[in-house]
UniProtKB/Swiss-Prot annotation:
Record-linked PROSITE patterns: C2
Organism this protein belongs to: Saccharomyces cerevisiae (strain ATCC 204508 / S288c) (Baker's yeast)
Keywords: Calcium, Decarboxylase, Endosome, Golgi apparatus, Lipid biosynthesis, Lipid metabolism, Lyase, Membrane, Metal-binding, Phospholipid biosynthesis, Phospholipid metabolism, Pyruvate, Repeat, Zymogen
GO biological-process terms attached to the record: intermembrane phospholipid transfer; phosphatidylcholine biosynthetic process; phosphatidylethanolamine biosynthetic process; protein autoprocessing
Protein name, UniProt field: Phosphatidylserine decarboxylase proenzyme 2
PTM characteristics: Is synthesized initially as an inactive proenzyme. Formation of the active enzyme involves a self-maturation process in which the active site pyruvoyl group is generated from an internal serine residue via an autocatalytic post-translational modification. Two non-identical subunits are generated from the proenzyme in this reaction, and the pyruvate is formed at the N-terminus of the alpha chain, which is derived from the carboxyl end of the proenzyme.
Cofactor binding: number and manner: Binds 1 pyruvoyl group covalently per subunit.
Gene of this entry: PSD2
Length: 1138
């Protein structure tokens, strides 16, 4: 049972096929008989899925080992290669007595030189690969020899020096002997029939060929047969519930799809470039498998795989070949692969054996990254006068293709203009003007990863330019999207700068054990909405001096918030103690500032929260504030930017170009425009002054909208939020104007960072934070944890709902496991809910009213009635007329249906990603398949309103309209607590509910769904079908328990309020009341909320009690909820006789 819900690895991944190769022995290899060798066998499908046998001595080839390799989930080739090498003695030079000596030269990049080779010549190649960290140095030298051994075989020795070696200069060299190449598509076919497969192959002999020496032959012959190897195979699936047959079918379809796409791309290339078709690949060299190949035209189903017909097809060229200079017919084209995750290029022929044992193990354990589909080749723009002579071009060959020099000379010269791209139209669509290509559009979704661009077998080297050009364009686009932007729709009103100076006259605290006074170690926690700052602490002082600063943005919906300041005493081992607190309204601070960019000093008296409550002198916080508006910052941006980053008085064209290039995307022509603006000749040595540069940038069209600015002019960095900012999910300072203001201010002042979720969490000790994370989950805005954070919409106060520790832990264990889906658990919840409802309908339950009011500190001044006969009558109590009036008379405003904690999502997909984690959650299931053409996951927005037991439990109409026929849906009684909603259980789709259609003239038809929950007796409606209701009119009520109301509305003509959407995207519930605006049609603007100034501590405490319970009441009841005591009494009575 998991306490903390983590990410399930591999849940959505395809099953992996495990191929077991039983390598028994090699036979009839002449080199092993002639020389004293140390044979080793490598088995590989590509660089990352490779294994090798142990190294044997004295030419012994009886390995008798079983190697396990994973088949790639996204295969690009059907071939399995079994390569036999001779492991040369450690430290020995990579040469043999009968071979000419070779020389190696270490260079910083791979160098390849080839020598001529006739059909009777023998080539010796020496590869020296030195790896250190992430740097790889490779040199390959070929030396030809006129000697003609019989039968001759090409040798390839490779030297490696790796960090895992025992000695610093230890060399591991391998001499190539031969290999077998086996098709995985043919390997498991039964020989007696073509309609069935066998995934366990008994040991058979397979021929080993010298592939390097045999490349100049039209077909294999005995001259290049070097021996045999005895192999057995077995294919398995790593997922037990998935049959091997099904997994192999999926793997084969994936491969056929990939190869079919390659075939089509190369066919287009041949037709567009007028080049002759490529040379045919050599067939499989296995003597134990059929030479017939599979035609790759369509995916295979499970039945097709069992009853397939044998057909012939061509063996296509590998899509990932690189281009190598071919000056002779005996040269080897090296296949290269690109590791997206590690940005490391490996040679699949040689570097499979260039890695030491530790590196091979690591590579083999890698999970394969999901490669995107291979794109078609995109050709870069080519000059008209460019001509290409194919006789001097580099040809790209398959591993076994040979092009004779005379064949190359016969190829015609082709103009680059004759080479057309299959994606010209796509490339033109991507090339947009600066005005149309708005890379700062917030509505577009940013891609998280770079797409892999693989070379797909082009015959011309310059065709790769299109790939690099497209990749570079994508890089520029993503870089711009991930950097600063200027939002025209919504930006901060300005930036507030706060100076925390000092505190005077703090009281000496009294030690509870020694009864002596001591000086504290104070620090300050300052919160403004969801931003929480914490100063450093001062040791043993009652008059601490901090001299620290805080700077942050203020948005329009935060103008009614206040600064909450708390002084805390730091303790080394025990919990930190709150000492004093105070409040300062932001609106009051703004009214006292007379001039822009002016510091306003404050002496704020502090209210003590420790004994004695009245010190000899009242503590005072000395601080100052400054507010700078956004228009002022934008107007002075370029002057401050140039003064900060440019020290020269005059700048020439080169200096201007360098400066603009550091800021973002500017061309040489852009720099010329600045000089032309002042009638300056750029290349005549003339220059412009700093003031002219500022003036030009302020009036220049390309700089006034800030689209091309990618880095901060002061720090020259792009927008990369800190780890603490990502953890707390704060409003990221991604606006260039406000970031530059804060960045410039931080250069000269010690500035604090908003790194905490709440002021209570900022004052906790480190071990408390560790314990909370281990038991409840990561304490952060937006994380899936057991901490329920609610923000009051009027004041901006963020408070955590108080739930006892064992209740949190119990709910986390139950709803993250399989218990909720069990029949016994569902039956228990239903029985308890019905029993509790009957109990609270009895007159004896009236005695529970007073403890409930006391525990939740409820204010009953707005209640219409005072006397209640049963607890349920009190629970669904009515309020006095006029207590919950709509905020506006505009009929195109949608209002809150209940006093609740609200989360809203513009799309259903967002709600699934952020809040509702049920596996089977869908609008179709929630609405009981009501009008699925209109109400589905693609067309609707959703609002979720959760009612806690202490809330007013009558629900009201959110708009004007006509009530449709209510549909009652029976279901379960799961809790609607966010911990359960964020589990994999579909709470909303399984619980009891009523579907109420409302036909509104302004919003169209919407669904109003009251949902019952644990301990809810029933859902009662006070409206009937065809009733015409107005905004705020009562529709019904819940009996005892927590509950939820969901509103589903088509989003084609509707938008939720921006502050609710912002909070919901960070998993923060917003406290709303009946009549508050929650959204509007697209015809009207969002309702501007009236600022509510709350200075009275009693009112602030009342808001906190509405969200949670008071500290005193929580402690008096053992820090457990009132429902817990009720359930405990019921359980004690039921099981008293046991």
């Amino acid at each position: 049972m998991r306490i903390i819900k983590g990410r399930k690895r591999g849940k959505n991944k395809k099953p992996t096929l495990i191929l077991k190769i039983h390598v028994i022995q090699a036979e009839n290899i002449e080199a092993l008989k002639t020389f004293n060798c140390n044979p080793v066998c490598f088995v590989t499908t590509n660089t990352f899925y490779s294994q090798k046998t142990n190294k044997l001595k004295n030419s012994n080839t009886h390995w008798n080992q079983t190697l396990r390799i994973k088949l790639p989930r996204n295969p690009t080739s059907e071939w399995l290669r079994i390569i036999v090498y001779d492991a040369l003695p450690t430290g020995a030079p990579p040469t043999t007595p009968s071979r000419p000596r070779t020389t190696t030269a270490n260079t910083s990049s791979s160098t390849l030189s080839n020598s001529g080779l006739s059909s009777h010549s023998h080539s010796s190649r020496n590869l020296n690969v030195t790896s250190k960290g992430n740097q790889t140095s490779t040199s390959i030298n070929s030396v030809s020899s006129s000697a003609t051994p019989a039968p001759s075989h090409s040798s390839s020795s490779l030297s490696t020096t790796g960090p895992g070696s025992t000695h610093k200069n230890r060399i591991n060299s391998y001499l190539y002997l031969g290999e077998a190449k086996i098709s995985l598509l043919d390997l498991f076919k039964r020989k007696d029939t073509t309609t069935s497969y066998k995934f366990s192959i008994e040991a058979q002999r397979y021929h080993l060929y010298d592939m390097k020496g045999g490349k100049d032959q039209d077909s294999l012959n005995c001259n290049f047969l070097v021996g045999d190897i005895l192999l057995g195979f077995k294919l398995e699936c790593n997922v037990k519930r998935t049959p091997t047959f099904q997994a192999f079918n999926a793997w084969r379809n994936e491969l056929n799809t990939y190869l079919g796409r390659i075939d089509r791309n190369k066919a287009r290339m041949r037709s567009s470039s007028s080049l002759p078709p490529p040379l045919e690949d050599m067939l499989s060299n296995s003597s134990a498998v059929s030479g017939n190949e599979i035609r790759r035209e369509k995916p295979y189903s499970d039945t097709d795989l069992a009853h397939d017909e044998e057909v012939n097809a061509e063996d296509e060229i590998d899509a990932e070949e690189s281009i190598e200079d071919m000056n002779s017919s005996g040269s080897i084209c090296t296949e290269r692969r690109y590791d997206i995750d590690n940005d490391t290029i490996f040679d699949s022929i040689s570097e499979v054996v260039s890695l030491n044992d530790e590196e091979l193990d690591i590579l083999n354990d890698f999970e394969e990254a999901d490669h995107p589909n291979v794109p078609d080749i995109n050709v870069h723009d080519i000059d008209e006068d460019t001509r290409i002579s194919l006789s001097s071009m580099i040809t790209a060959l398959d591993e076994y293709d040979i092009v004779e020099p005379e064949d190359v000379a016969k190829l015609p010269a082709v103009s680059e203009n004759d080479i057309t791209s299959v994606d010209d139209e796509e490339s033109e669509n991507q090339q947009e003007s600066d005005e149309e290509f708005d890379i700062y559009n917030e509505d577009e979704r940013e891609d998280s990863d770079f797409q892999s661009k693989e070379y797909i077998g082009s015959r011309l080297l310059h065709l790769q330019r299109g790939k690099h050009n497209k990749s570079y364009a994508n890089y520029l686009y993503r870089r711009a999207k991930s950097n600063f932007f200027i939002s025209k729709k919504e930006h901060a009103m300005g930036v507030v700068f706060m100076h925390i100076g000092a505190i005077k006259n703090l009281p000496a605290l009294r030690n509870r054990l020694s009864k002596t006074n001591y000086e504290m170690d104070p620090f300050i926690v300052i919160s403004f909405g969801r931003r929480v700052f914490k100063t450093s602490w001062r040791k043993h002082t009652l008059n601490p001096e901090f001299n620290e600063y805080a700077a942050f943005e203020v948005f329009p919906h935060e103008t009614n918030f206040a600064f909450s300041i708390k002084v805390v005493d730091k303790d080394s081992f025990s919990f930190n103690d709150d000492v004093a607190k105070c409040e300062l309204a932001w609106f009051d601070m703004l009214q006292q500032q007379q001039h822009e960019n002016e510091w306003i000093p404050y002496e704020i008296p502090l209210d003590l929260t420790v004994e004695p409550a009245h010190a000899p002198k009242q503590p005072v916080l000395y601080s100052s504030f400054k507010y700078v508006s956004y228009p002022f910052l934008k107007k002075s941006f370029w002057k401050e930017a140039v003064d900060t980053s440019v020290n020269l008085e005059r700048l020439d064209i080169i200096q201007v170009m360098l400066y603009l290039e550091r800021l973002g995307s500017f061309t040489m022509a852009d720099s010329f425009e600045l000089f032309q603006h002042f009638n300056k000749s750029a290349w005549a040595g003339q220059s412009i002054t700093r003031s002219q540069l500022v003036e030009g940038l302020q009036s220049w069209r390309k700089s006034t909208n800030f689209k091309r600015i990618w880095t901060c002019p002061r720090c020259m960095r792009s927008c990369k939020p800190t780890r603490n900012a990502r953890r707390s999910k704060l409003v990221l300072e991604n606006d260039l104007i406000t970031h530059f203001a804060i960045c410039t201010f931080s250069k000269e002042h010690k500035t604090l960072k908003p790194s905490y979720v709440s002021s209570a969490f900022a004052s906790k000790r480190w071990f408390s934070k560790v314990l909370i994370k281990l038991t409840y989950g990561k304490y952060a805005l937006g994380s899936n944890n057991a901490n329920i954070l609610v923000q009051d919409r009027d004041t901006g106060i963020i408070i955590e709902e108080k739930i006892s520790a064992h209740v949190k832990l119990g709910m986390r264990i139950i709803y993250n496991g399989k218990s909720p889906e069990s029949k016994k658990f569902r039956s228990l919840l239903k029985t308890l809910s019905i029993r509790q409802g009957k109990k609270f309908d009895s007159t004896a339950s009236a005695k529970q009213i007073e403890p409930f009011i006391k525990f939740h500190s409820l204010d009953l001044s707005q209640c219409r009635d005072k006397d209640f006969k049963t607890f349920n009558e009190f629970f669904y109590r009515k309020l006095k007329p006029g207590s919950r009036l709509p905020e506006s008379n505009n009929k195109e405003i949608l209002f809150s249906p209940a006093d609740s904690r609200c989360t809203v999502f513009p799309t259903i997909q967002e709600s699934k990603e952020i809040w509702v984690k049920g596996r089977k959650f869908s609008i179709k299931k929630l609405a009981n398949n009501y009008n699925p053409e209109t109400f589905n996951d693609n067309n609707c927005s959703i609002g979720i309103f959760r009612l806690a037991p202490q809330d007013y439990h009558r629900f009201h109409s959110p708009c004007n309209g006509t009530i449709g026929k209510p549909v009652y849906v029976d279901g379960e009684y799961y809790t609607v607590n966010p911990m359960a909603v964020r589990s994999e259980l579909d709470v909303f789709g399984e619980n009891i509910r009523v579907i109420i259609p409302i036909d509104s003239p302004q919003f169209g038809k919407l669904l109003y769904i009251p949902i019952g929950a644990m301990m809810v007796g029933s859902i009662l409606l006070t409206c009937k079908e065809n009733d015409v209701v107005e905004s705020g009119q009562e529709l019904g009520y819940f009996k005892f328990g927590g509950s939820t109301i969901i509103i589903i509305i088509p989003h084609n003509n509707f938008m939720f309020d921006s502050d609710l959407v912002k909070n919901s995207s960070e998993r923060i519930e917003t406290l709303v009341k009946v009549g508050m605006s929650i959204g509007h049609t697209s015809n009207v603007n969002e309702l501007k909320r009236i600022r509510i100034k709350v200075d009275d501590p009693k009112k602030i405490e009342r808001i906190k009690r509405t969200i949670s319970v008071s500290d005193e009441n929580a402690k008096s009841t053992g820090n457990v909820t009132w429902e817990y005591h009720t359930l405990r009494e019921m359980m004690n009575k039921d099981f008293a006789g046991l």
